[in-house]
């Protein structure tokens, strides 16, 4: 059992602090911490010459939360794909004390955008974990595509559709098959992919449907 996993990100401090000033008590330590954090983040961007990348501080905080969600999702998928693990605890639903960036909810108990949504998605009863190895692919060397199914419910007959798309939407790889998605952890697909003619960024997408053509 893994007692604690989780990345971190700041809340969207522009809105949080504005609401706290209007509706909360600005004398509380929590408000002072968040106000100081926001001011220090602004100073840091200016001092490092990176302010032009984030003229809107909201976008800076939301991008942090996207990294937070992406990391949480990958860690949860890894743990749930490991047959030697019986469970895990996500740290944390709310941030507080000296761990202000750990929470999936902000000071007002509002979800922290993608940090919350990605963690929630990775905790669904049925998920597929998609891995390409290596993550950064040299065209001449190819890549290995591995898809693992994690099913905490009953077994179900399923239809899988796997596609790899370029940034422009061109489909460069496609495969489909039917199988019984068993309860537990199942290796669903593994194949070496020829990438000789590829260049740029590509995304792997997997659709899983039941016999009633409903997405799972």
Task: Please name every model-derived segment.
Residues 169-198:
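Intrinsically disordered, low-complexity Pro/Gly/Ser/Thr-rich segments with frequent PxxP/GP/PP motifs
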Residues 47, 124-125, 191-200:
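Extended interaction regions within the primary functional domain
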Residues 158, 196-216:
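Terminal connector regions
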Residues 1-159, 167, 171-173, 179-181:
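Substrate-binding clefts and catalytic carboxylate motifs of secreted carbohydrate-active enzymes
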Residues 141-145, 188, 203:
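Short, solvent-exposed loop/turn segments enriched in Ser/Thr/Gly
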